[in-house]
């Protein structure tokens, strides 16, 4: 008797990754998003490429290196030696959201760069998380003497004053100023892995909508429905996209 082994579809594979919040593989889930455009992509190879970067980074650190030294070494390695930076010339290119492309070109958007940076940071023992900051995804590291917030698009660390300046336009737009001002600490809470993937997908959703790319839009919305089964607006938008697709 011949047994036929079939690989799961990209969507089924994604669904298997995002089932549990307790065991949510952020890097793998983020890497798998590219399979909509690269159906033959070997996600494990992408993870292996990141592991190789991790090994190179660890060779630069003494076992007893202090957290601040680990952070400085990571930033030197990631932003200067490897040359990761924001794609300022083509910010809305979908490739900026695909980790295989970001690893190849060293260009991305804040959230895709953040996913790679966080993976390396956690791999060298840093307490690093993403921040769903309005308009621009950030990363933070908790150190013994305080918290450092970094813009993954530039590698720049940001003070509370600089963060407040970036936040002010969004607060004014929402009427959250003066007596209704929200403490900045509420905007610096760690983003859960599911929320990170949702933000990447919604970035792609916005790009595909703006380009009237209905095929790609439906694929992204299929993932959003799997990721956020209670997000009824995504079901509605998927139905609209199907109608536009014909």
What are these regions (language model features)?
Residues 1-246:
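A structural boundary/capping signal
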